[in-house]
Amino acid sequence: MRNTFRCLRNALGGACVALLLTGCAQPWQAVPPGADASVLTARLGPPREVYDLPDGGKRLMWPTQPLGEFTTAADVDVSGKVINVRQVLDENEFYKAQIGVWTKKDVLVNFGRPVETSYFPLMKREVWTYRYMEANIWYMMYSFYFDDQGIVRLTQKTPDPLHDPDRRNVF
């Protein structure tokens, strides 16, 4: 009886800790629209990538690639005020890419530098690949295939081999 109570208490304690941790916000989530961009750099450090936006603003990015699955992106207006902050390596963000319309520049500005680039000569396609978490559960790779003019012609998602339990001890 005593061991049963102890196991139940430990399980309940572990569940409470897990619940509390899920409520923890990421540092960028507490930055409201309209805040000065310096608030972000104070919390996250200087951005590793900066891109110009069509309206004259900037997109600041803090990637965790090549081994991470997250890139925090902040859109900042010309006066240096935050418009929005979000995690861009996400299936809903990837699905915004328009086949036949988006270019390499569009992909770069929206998702940052890829974790991997390759070229398939028989397809005549350059491929940019990004790591991400799908539904915060599955480790995935999302790839953009570009034609010779740099236009997105195909996208593809696949499981991330880095997290494949059958391939962990290859070497």
Feature locations, PLM:
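Residue-level marker of intrinsically disordered, low-complexity segments enriched
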Residues: 15-17, 125
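Bacterial N-terminal signal peptides that target proteins for export
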Residues: 2-15
